């Protein structure tokens, strides 16, 4: 496995691999890898592609009072996990390599990034789409793999690829969970044992919401309020949002029909966790 810090080196290696007839797969990450990331690699390897993993904690997607400075970083640990999973190349640039001067150009997807995490974290998705578009230009992959725990992000990236005519297939990979149901996240390490136990209410509430839906409940507002009540009764978590949206365009829905997703964001102490469940209406 190769570790590159420079854009030029990545481009040279990718060009060489293409010359040998190989396709290129990109797995973008911010590092501190867990099984969710490694599942993306597993999916990427199925096509026989040369697998590039980016590990870059992108400052543009963090707000002024967020956790950029303390976001976990451990390249040695990540390199071992990545190599064991079959990654061919890690691209781990410094901030100065990705943004060598004041960044005057940004990529932003309107509408899809205005709600949910976009409303709670202004500028977040502009930072995401800017860095992902840069990675797409640098690596020029045939396919890129994203986890669907960040379902809103996945839809935004798909829209960006469509609108900007990137010749890239975006592949969404289902949420990977711990044995007890907690969605895997690099931020889970911030949780105290008590907070982690409380955080299991996210998966429980999504499961209950599915039960209510299967029993015939179709009012989005009713399900949202029942989820909030459950979270408040069973944890000390501070709810950021509980919303049911169209899984196609993120529009609010009143009556559940078609494909929807239930999106949650809850803060346990200083740690903000997200989770979701996609359902097919009748």
Swiss-Prot record:
Pathway as given in its UniProt record: Cofactor biosynthesis; (R)-pantothenate biosynthesis; (R)-pantothenate from (R)-pantoate and beta-alanine: step 1/1
EC numbers on record: 6.3.2.1
Active site residues according to the UniProt entry: 37
Binding-site positions, (R)-pantoate: 61, 153
Superkingdom of the source species: Bacteria
Catalyzed reaction equations: (R)-pantoate + beta-alanine + ATP = (R)-pantothenate + AMP + diphosphate + H(+)
Annotated binding of beta-alanine, by residue: 61
GO molecular function: ATP binding; pantoate-beta-alanine ligase activity
Gene Ontology CC: cytosol
GO annotation, biological process: pantothenate biosynthetic process
Keyword Transit peptide: no
Cellular localization per UniProt: Cytoplasm
Binding-site residues, ATP: 30-37, 147-150, 176, 184-187
EC class: ligase
Listed CDD domains: PanC
InterPro entries tied to this protein: Cyt_trans-like, Pantoate_ligase, Pantoate_ligase_C, Rossmann-like_a/b/a_fold
Keyword terms, alphabetized: ATP-binding, Cytoplasm, Ligase, Nucleotide-binding, Pantothenate biosynthesis
Major subcellular location class: cytoplasm
UniProt key word Cytoplasm: yes
Miscellaneous comment text of the record: The reaction proceeds by a bi uni uni bi ping pong mechanism.
Similarity section: Belongs to the pantothenate synthetase family.
Known function: Catalyzes the condensation of pantoate with beta-alanine in an ATP-dependent reaction via a pantoyl-adenylate intermediate.
HAMAP family tied to this protein: PanC
NCBIfam families in alphabetical order: cyt_tran_rel, panC
PANTHER family in the cross-refs: CYTIDYLATE KINASE/PANTOATE-BETA-ALANINE LIGASE, PANTOATE--BETA-ALANINE LIGASE
Name this protein carries in UniProt: Pantothenate synthetase
Organism expressing this protein natively: Desulfitobacterium hafniense (strain Y51)
Classification lineage: Bacteria, Bacillati, Bacillota, Clostridia, Eubacteriales
Gene designation per UniProt: panC
């Amino acid at each position: 496995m190769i570790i590159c810090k420079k854009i030029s080196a990545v481009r040279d290696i990718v060009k060489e691999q293409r010359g040998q007839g190989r396709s290129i797969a990109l797995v973008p990450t911010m590092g501190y890898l867990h099984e969710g990331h490694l599942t993306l690699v597993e999916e990427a390897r199925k096509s026989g592609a040369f697998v590039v993993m980016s590990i870059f904690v992108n400052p543009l997607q963090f707000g002024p009072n967020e956790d950029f400075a303390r976001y976990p970083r451990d390249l040695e640990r990540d390199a071992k996990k990545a190599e064991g999973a079959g990654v061919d190349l890690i691209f781990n640039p410094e901030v100065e390599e990705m943004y060598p001067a004041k960044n005057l150009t940004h990529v932003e997807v309107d509408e899809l990034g205005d709600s949910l995490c976009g409303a709670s974290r202004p500028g977040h998705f502009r930072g995401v789409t800017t860095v992902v578009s840069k990675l797409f230009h640098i690596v020029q992959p045939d396919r890129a793999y994203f986890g669907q725990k960040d379902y809103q992000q996945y839809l935004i990236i798909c829209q960006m690829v469509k609108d900007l005519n990137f010749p890239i297939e975006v592949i969404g990979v289902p949420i990977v969970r711990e044995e007890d149901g907690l969605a895997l996240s690099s931020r889970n390490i911030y949780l105290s044992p008590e907070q982690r136990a409380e955080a299991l209410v996210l998966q429980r509430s999504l499961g209950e919401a599915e039960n209510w839906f299967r029993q015939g409940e179709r009012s989005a507002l009713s399900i949202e309020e029942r989820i909030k009540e459950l979270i408040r009764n069973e944890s000390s978590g501070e709810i950021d949002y509980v919303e049911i949206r169209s899984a196609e365009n993120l529009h609010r829905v009143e009556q559940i029909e078609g494909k929807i997703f239930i999106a949650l964001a809850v803060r346990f102490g200083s740690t903000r966790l997200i989770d979701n469940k996609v359902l097919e209406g009748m």
